[in-house]
A protein has these predicted regions:
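Small-residue helix-packing motif on alpha-helices
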Residues: 42, 52, 70, 209-216, ...
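Internal alpha-helical scaffold of NAD(P)-dependent oxidoreductase catalytic cores
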Residues: 14, 114-126, 142-180, 193-230
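Catalytic, metal-anchored helix/loop core of enzyme active sites in primary metabolism
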Residues: 182-184, 196, 282
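Rossmann-like NAD(P)(H) cofactor-binding subdomain of soluble oxidoreductases
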Residues: 28-29, 49, 55-58, 64-145, ...
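NAD(P)-dependent Rossmann-like dehydrogenase/reductase catalytic/cofactor-binding core
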Residues: 2-5, 12, 218-284
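NAD(P)+-binding Rossmann beta1-loop-alpha1 motif at the extreme N-terminus of oxidoreductases
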Residues: 1-68, 72, 204-206
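Short pre-catalytic strand/loop immediately N-terminal to key active-site residues, enriched for Gly-Thr
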Residues: 16, 128, 177-183, 235-240
Length: 284
């Protein structure tokens, strides 16, 4: 289904143009700059003056209100507009993109086929879709990526180089897996925020201040995640390690299981997946 990305071994950065300058675009740009990408390799097209000034403050000089030759001929063109904007933001690029430009879309719900139609692209291998998540904003993201079989190794390497700047990259076997990874890691941060929010609320009910309860919940989640990353043991075994027979943790875990938490999580993830599929159909 998916494969963790391996070191791509590129020594130079491609030229990268962005259509859209929202949070995810800024996250990728920030990650690229931290990775040593020259500011001159990056250009951005955004409609608002405030966003252009923000990007200028990041060191990006090539920030414009409309696409030009840099965008049409970039090695990578990153589409980072909102789904409802594709009908107006993409047609100005139609039939002007260089055949050598690889299009990387971070737009949720818009299929490669739809993008190809909007951009006037005949080779679907020119388009790569990805689904980052919000921890990408601090370089701790997970990004699922899918490209057609005709997308060559050089293009895949450039895409990996860009996305590794914001976290871990997984290549997906099918475009349909974009819906699956949306349900797990794309929407996943909100699931953990909800659990931390609920745990914090329980702490407040026990008498802790909101500040202390929030810190306890967040640090516990962070510590558990880091332990899971560094330990060779499975998640189930790590849980068992904390759950002494007849102890306090076992009582809590049993309450979760009896309350249907595992099934509820599966149901929630499936609901996210189905909504992702629906959005793709609505935007087709």
């Amino acid at each position: 289904m998916l494969t963790p990305n391996e070191d791509v071994g590129l020594s130079t950065f491609p030229t990268i143009a962005f259509i859209g300058g929202g949070n995810m675009a800024k996250a990728i740009i920030g990650g690229l700059l931290d990775s040593g990408c020259p500011t001159g390799n990056i250009s951005v097209v955004v409609p608002t003056q405030a966003t252009r000034l923000t990007l200028n403050a990041m060191g990006i000089e090539q920030v414009n209100s409309s696409p030009g030759s840099r965008e049409f001929n970039a090695d990578i063109l990153v589409l980072a507009v909102k789904p409802q904007m594709v009908a107006t933001a993409l047609p100005p690029l139609k039939a002007q993109l260089s055949a050598r430009t690889t299009v990387l879309s971070v737009i949720a719900g818009v299929t490669a086929e739809t993008l190809a139609q909007l951009l006037g692209i005949s080779d679907i291998g020119q388009i790569v879709r990805c689904m980052p998540n919000t921890p990408s904003l601090i370089g701790q993201g997970v990004t699922g990526v899918h490209a057609a079989d005709s997308t060559d190794a050089a293009k895949r390497a450039m895409i990996s180089q860009i996305l590794e700047a914001i976290g871990e990259v997984f290549w997906l076997d099918s475009e349909g897996d974009i819906d699956n990874i949306t349900a797990i890691s794309g929407s996943g941060p909100a699931y953990f925020f909800l659990f931390m929010e609920s745990l914090s609320a329980a702490g407040v009910a026990m008498g802790f201040s909101e500040e202390v309860a929030s810190k306890l919940a967040v640090q516990t989640a962070l510590g558990a995640a880091r332990l899971a990353q560094q330990s060779p043991e499975t998640l189930a075994q790590l849980r068992r390690n904390v759950t002494s027979p007849g102890g306090t943790t076992e009582q809590a875990i049993n309450t979760f299981i009896e309350g249907g938490l595992p099934a509820l999580v599966a149901s929630a993830a499936n609901a996210s997946k189905q909504r992702s599929i629906e959005i793709s159909k609505e935007l087709a």
